[in-house]
Amino acid sequence: MGRYLGPLTKVSRRLGVFVGGSLKAFQKRNFPPGQHGRVQGRKVKLSDYAIRLQEKQKLRYLYGGIREKQFKRYFDEAARSAGNTGQILLQLLERRLDNVVYRLGFAKTRRQARQLVRHGHFLVNGRKVDIPSYRVDPGDIIELREKSRNSPLFKENLESRDPRSIPNWLELDKENFRGKVLEIPQEIELEIPVNVQLIIEFYSM
């Protein structure tokens, strides 16, 4: 399965939670696409498989629509590691460079962060890295390259981000367009509720 490049609002409607796109459009029509209005007095019962698939899709799209093969590789690595599989899976996703760029406030969405990384706007420890899936480690310095610092896009994104939303495993130096990875993320707060245990069960079916 390739990466979905269509409207994320439609994906949000299908999953029933906002994973991207237009929040206003989702709030106005938060029922699955293809339905002409809401189904009144009747709730579609999902199979056990469909429920678990839906949780996996939520997490995939929350992190910008990661390809299925790549997402499965993350899961396999987490499953092989010692410790809580679900927690390790989230840690691997959080340590992606595009996610860190988003978490620091350089981008408004993870999709935007992926594009900005690909276009070579960021340095990691002084070297340009244009691979969105690049995995950061504690001590890594992520900074905006000099040529990009006058861009209104980055200034606007940083100004609009509430400093309190930056997780405690990251540190932002807004004046110097620089962030630092302090530690491996432990308490990970997702923007939407995701039952990671159901994702583990999905890959065990």
From Swiss-Prot:
One of its GO terms (molecular function) is structural constituent of ribosome. One of its GO terms (cellular component) is small ribosomal subunit. Residues 95-163 form the S4 RNA-binding domain. SUPFAM superfamilies: Alpha-L RNA-binding motif (SSF55174). GO terms for biological process: ribosomal small subunit biogenesis; translation. It holds the Pfam family Ribosomal_S4. Keywords: Ribonucleoprotein, Ribosomal protein, RNA-binding, rRNA-binding. NCBIfam families: PRK05327.1, rpsD_bact. Belongs to the universal ribosomal protein uS4 family. Part of the 30S ribosomal subunit. Contacts protein S5. The interaction surface between S4 and S5 is involved in control of translational fidelity. One of the primary rRNA binding proteins, it binds directly to 16S rRNA where it nucleates assembly of the body of the 30S subunit. With S5 and S12 plays an important role in translational accuracy. HAMAP family: Ribosomal_uS4_B. This is Small ribosomal subunit protein uS4. It comes from Persephonella marina (strain DSM 14350 / EX-H1).
